[in-house]
Design a protein with these regions (language model features):
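N-terminal secretory signal peptides and thylakoid transit peptides that target proteins
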Residues: 1-17
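Conserved alpha-helix/loop element of class I SAM-dependent methyltransferases that forms part
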Residues: 32-48
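Conserved class I S-adenosyl-L-methionine
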Residues: 49-56
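Glycine-rich SAM-binding Motif I of class I
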Residues: 60
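Conserved SAM-binding motif I beta-strand of class I
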Residues: 73-78
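S-adenosyl-L-methionine
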Residues: 88-110
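C-terminal substrate-binding/active-site "lid" region of AdoMet-derived donor-dependent transferases
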Residues: 126-177
Length: 177
C-alpha cells in the first residue's frame, strides 16, 4: 500500500493493519462520530436488555454510549493496550464502569457468544474473516451493525445512510453456523 492510500484510509477512519517488516502489526484507529454511534445503536434497536460488543473498540465510545443512553451492558475488544486503558478511564469518568468492560485482545479470538449486538468499523477483508465467527458464536436473533463495510456475501436485513456514511444491519438467522 502506498503512502497516499494509507493516509486516505486513516483519514477516513478505517482501522488498518500494516505489516512493514516489523514483527508486530501497527494498528491505526479513528473514532466513530457520536451521531454515527447513536445511529448504529438505533439501527440495532439496542435496549437495556442487550449486551453490546464492539470489536475493535478503540476509545470505547460505542459500549460507553450503549450503557449511558440505552442502559445496555457493553464489552469492547481492543488490541491496543493504551486504548483499553483510555476506555476504562472514560467508563469510570462516565460512571458506567459497572456496566462496561474492556478486554485487551484479538477480536478474532475473543469469545463473543454473550453478545446480543455486535458493532464493527473494520474493513471488507476483516469483516469477511469475521463472518463465520459471527454466524457460529452468536445466538439466532443477535444483531450485527457495520459502519461503512459489508460482511462478505451476507445480505443485510436493513441499511441506513447517515452523514454520507452507510450503515448495515444483519440479524443472525436460525442455523446460521
Amino acid at each position: 500500500m502506498n503512502r497516499r492510500d494509507l493516509l486516505r484510509s486513516c483519514a477516513a477512519g478505517i482501522p488498518l493493519t500494516i505489516v512493514s517488516g516489523a514483527r508486530a502489526p501497527q494498528m491505526y484507529w479513528a473514532g466513530t462520530p457520536q451521531r454515527i454511534v447513536e445511529a448504529m445503536l438505533d439501527l440495532a434497536r439496542v435496549t437495556a436488555g442487550d449486551v453490546v460488543y464492539d470489536l475493535g473498540s478503540g476509545d470505547g465510545r460505542i459500549p460507553i454510549i450503549a450503557a449511558q443512553k440505552y442502559g445496555a451492558r457493553g464489552v469492547g475488544v481492543e488490541i491496543q493496550p493504551q486504548l483499553v486503558r483510555r476506555s476504562r478511564q472514560t467508563a469510570r469518568d462516565g460512571a458506567v464502569d459497572d456496566r462496561v468492560t474492556f478486554v485487551e485482545g484479538d477480536l478474532f479470538k475473543a469469545d463473543i457468544s454473550a453478545a446480543t449486538v455486535v458493532t464493527l468499523w473494520l474493513n471488507d477483508r476483516m469483516n469477511a474473516r469475521l463472518e463465520p465467527k459471527l454466524k457460529t458464536e452468536l445466538k439466532p436473533g443477535s444483531r450485527v451493525v457495520s459502519h461503512q463495510f459489508r460482511i462478505g456475501q451476507w445480505v443485510p436485513a436493513q441499511t441506513s445512510h447517515v452523514d454520507d456514511v452507510d450503515l448495515f444491519l444483519w440479524v443472525v438467522p436460525e442455523h446460521a453456523g
